[in-house]
A protein has these predicted regions:
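Histidine-dependent nucleotide/RNA phosphoesterase domain, centered on the 2H-phosphoesterase fold
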Residues: 1-169
Length: 169
């Protein structure tokens, strides 16, 4: 997969328009987690090289459940087997909306636990067997309906992005 970081950001660090489709769990309403994110981001702001980072906005804190398609990454192994690589973005949105109109697996909570702090993210994993099973069911369902299965599907590292390193240190 190509490095999309330079495409995601303007030179001044602001986010560029970056269209695509991904299934996420929005976390910005989780008060306990947001307190931790605020502490981590405040420490980042104290770094002498903070200008090389863009911190994730508070209202965008999420955990990616499964990546789907990105307009800027039209490579076969990162694309739907059901759609041509040149499919217009709106057709992709419409296709996924139809395929995932029924999303029956969201009734139960999924509990995650922190495994470690990465350079730019909090690494997490399912906290119990039920959560691991539910998360895998969701990922399998979406993958099958969307025709998308990235090479790292079975070993995806769940994480919560605190920020993005735009310029190498």
């Amino acid at each position: 997969m190509k490095n999309l970081t330079k495409i995601k950001f303007k030179e001044n660090g602001e986010f560029n328009h970056f269209p695509g489709n991904t299934v996420v769990a929005n976390l910005y309403t989780k008060q306990d987690l947001m307190e931790v994110v605020d502490i981590i981001q405040s420490r980042y702001r104290e770094l002498p090289f903070i200008d090389k980072f863009t911190l994730t906005p508070r209202n965008s804190i999420h955990m990616t459940v499964i990546e789907l398609l990105c307009h800027e990454n039209r490579e076969t192994e990162f694309w739907s087997s059901n759609l041509p690589l040149d499919t217009p973005l709106q057709e992709i949105h419409d296709y996924f909306a139809k395929q995932l109109e029924i999303f029956p697996l969201l009734d139960e909570e999924i509990h995650m636990r922190v495994t470690e702090m990465g350079k730019q993210n909090i690494l997490v994993e399912p906290a119990d067997e039920a959560s691991a099973k539910r998360l895998e069911e969701i990922r399998t369902y979406v993958s099958e309906k969307a025709g998308v299965r990235f090479p790292n599907h079975d070993r995806y590292q769940f994480h919560i992005s605190i920020g993005y390193l735009r310029i190498p240190l």
